[in-house]
Design a protein with these regions (language model features):
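Active-site neighborhoods and metal-handling regions in enzymes and metal-associated proteins
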Residues: 1-298
Length: 298
């Protein structure tokens, strides 16, 4: 037995974040329909998180077709959903303790691809637990996705969740690997299979709407300094959207902060062949004898 106190404030806040997130994810997914605005869904979800007592851990990601991650609407985005594959990736934190989840809403008729990532997550959860090598989880994901005739996205992984940290060790691969990390009681991890009808790798695009603080710095430009103050006070080290910034000159300020390596951007990640990507994700607490899923639907 470990000495982890699973009833401590840390884990209670992780559970609270997961409960909020499960509700928001399910309700947001129901809002995704042909003709509905991307921005409307993202802003609804972010507002609902706050209404329920949490804060967004990162901007709502709305990835379309070949997009796999880091896509969020612009400030005045007028994009609407078409007959597409839509991935919603949403995060919540309660006092810096996080939960992360994702679901595919298929409006494109590629229901088998959506099913592949969902079933792969179920298989991964069956394997996960204390003492389990993460390579075994990856093997379970890979087997299911390839059984559907698709490929896992091998350069995207699940990940640990820390206090005010969205991505920490261990990485949870989506294919079998040797000599991976071992899950331990008390770990909080996001398990996140991605499936594609392409070759199984993503690459960076040119668009960036999500950013995060890289380091604290003294900034001379007044607007950039005001933007940096908002970032530091409101978002700390967690990712934020350009549309969340109050300054009407936020785009220019972000450019200057990037040039000084004060913030970094997250380019939209796309399947390298332009093929569809599906995704399913849950956050779990590794217990003494298995895992507790914090983001399961209630």
């Amino acid at each position: 037995m470990s000495d982890v106190d699973f009833e401590s404030e840390q884990y209670e806040k992780c559970r609270e974040a997961g409960e909020i997130l499960a509700q928001v994810r399910d309700e947001a997914a129901e809002r995704v329909e042909v003709g509905v605005s991307h921005l409307e869904v993202a802003e609804w979800a972010e507002a609902k998180i706050r209404e329920l007592g949490g804060e967004p851990a990162f901007p709502v990601n709305i990835s379309i077709d070949e997009e796999a991650a880091h896509a969020t609407p612009e400030r005045d985005d007028d994009s609407t959903f078409g007959e597409e594959m839509v991935n919603l990736d949403i995060g919540v934190h309660v006092d810096g303790w996080l939960a992360d989840t994702a679901v595919t809403v298929d409006l494109s008729g590629h229901d088998e691809l959506a099913a592949a990532s969902e079933e792969a997550l179920d298989a991964a959860l069956d394997v996960a637990g204390p003492g389990v090598d993460v390579g075994q989880i990856g093997a379970a994901v890979e087997e299911v996705i390839e059984g559907y005739g698709f490929n896992p996205v091998v350069n995207l992984t699940g990940h640990g969740l820390g206090h005010w940290e969205q991505h920490t060790a261990p990485n949870i691969p989506n294919r079998e690997v040797s000599q991976g990390a071992t899950l331990e009681p008390g770990d909080v991890v996001a398990i996140e299979p991605f499936a594609t009808d392409g070759r199984g790798k993503v690459q960076e695009g040119s668009d960036e709407e999500i950013f995060a603080l890289e380091r604290e710095a003294t900034v001379r430009d007044r607007t950039a300094r005001q933007v940096l103050e908002q970032i530091t006070e409101e978002f700390k080290t967690l990712p934020f959207a350009a549309r969340w910034l109050d300054s009407p000159r936020a785009t220019m300020a972000l450019r200057r902060l990037k040039q000084q390596d004060v913030v970094h951007g997250y380019p939209v990640l796309k399947e390298q062949d332009g093929k569809f990507v599906s995704q399913k994700e849950h956050t779990v607490i590794v217990t003494e004898d298995g895992v507790e899923v914090t983001t399961r639907s209630r």
